[in-house]
């Protein structure tokens, strides 16, 4: 059973998703079939508290298990600010790496102001073997972002929507890991930008919400649905690779 092994671990963190935005938590409008399936087959938490109501400190709290202020971050971090997750803090990936896990991070970092600069620690300094990230939000929007950095190297413009880009980076890393080191467990931190603004969504999904009172609502609904589809891609890859039953999959916001 899962308890007898060192399971793989996938943690998916959304940005600004409300607890009432998923069908499995009572939403009657937004289609989230993959997350509904995950909730139906697992444990659905009804009492959960973030370490902070804003972005950067909540991420620091998740990664360290500490009150964010104690780890050096007390508010969201604007670009260029001399604030960052303190070097030397113990994190989930750093401790799992010590335990023999391979580690990957893909998506929104937002734990420092001077992203991909040598005078502040970067994702790799906190235990991630491979990282593919932005400092803050996908820019100029979720569509065709151009601010990703892969393990210290700028990627440039990437076609597609951020959540699919992040999901496919994650899947590609997992596939390579399983092919080369199948006996080594892995930890994958998937930090979607969705549905934080600036929002953009596939038009075919936007058109699927004709009863929305305004286009902005339809864009948001479609954004959550598109994120759900990206979760489905990751879940499908775990099934295809035959490792789903030995993978602890956690979704939160």
Language-model region placement:
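Formylglycine-dependent sulfatase
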Residues: 1-253
């Amino acid at each position: 059973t899962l308890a007898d092994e060192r399971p793989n671990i996938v943690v998916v963190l959304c940005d600004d998703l409300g607890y009432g935005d998923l069908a499995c938590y009572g939403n009657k409008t937004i289609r989230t079939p993959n997350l509904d399936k995950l909730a139906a087959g697992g444990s659905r938490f009804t009492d959960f508290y973030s370490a902070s109501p804003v972005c950067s400190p909540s991420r620091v709290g998740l990664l360290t298990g500490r009150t964010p202020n104690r780890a050096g971050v007390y508010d969201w971090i604007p670009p260029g600010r001399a604030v960052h997750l303190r070097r030397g803090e113990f994190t989930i990936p750093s401790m799992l790496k010590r335990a023999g896990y391979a580690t990957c991070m893909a998506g929104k970092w937002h734990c420092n102001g001077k992203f991909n600069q040598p005078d502040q620690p970067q994702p790799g300094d906190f235990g991630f073997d491979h990282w593919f990230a932005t400092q803050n939000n996908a820019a100029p929007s979720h569509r065709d972002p151009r601010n990703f950095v892969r393990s210290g190297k700028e990627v440039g413009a990437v076609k597609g929507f951020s959540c699919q880009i992040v999901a496919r980076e994650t899947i590609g890393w997992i596939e390579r890991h399983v092919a080369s080191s199948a006996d080594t467990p892995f930890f994958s931190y998937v930090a979607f930008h969705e549905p934080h603004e600036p929002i953009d969504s596939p038009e075919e999904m936007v058109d699927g919400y004709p009863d929305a009172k305004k286009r902005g609502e339809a864009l948001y609904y479609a954004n959550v649905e598109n994120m759900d589809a990206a979760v489905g891609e990751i879940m499908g890859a775990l099934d295809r690779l035959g490792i789903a039953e030995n993978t602890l999959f956690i979704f939160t916001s």
